[in-house]
Amino acid sequence: LTTRYVLLAAAEADLREIIRYTRQQWGNAQTRSYMLKLQDGIESLATGQGFFKDMSAFHPGLRMARCEHHYIFCIPRNDMPALMVAILHKQMDLMTRLESRPK
């Protein structure tokens, strides 16, 4: 099985916070369901499937896709796993948050 993506530390922290918040607000079953949807969204973006927006004007190669209530940001790489840069809630100031992320 080939790894299609890797989570940068900041994206991993985003995912942990999403899990914590979802579990606290809606319980374990909803958390599992939401995480499966996010995982599918991450996989799709990593492989260039589905709908995504080219954000190269912000950073070379950067892609963004909406998944449920979040936006996933990814930098695909040739012959290497895609880098997942951030997973941010739709109500956040996305560009401000991204500016503080490693590039």
What do the PLM-derived regions correspond to, one by one?
Residues 20, 40-43, 86:
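Generic alpha-helical structural context detector
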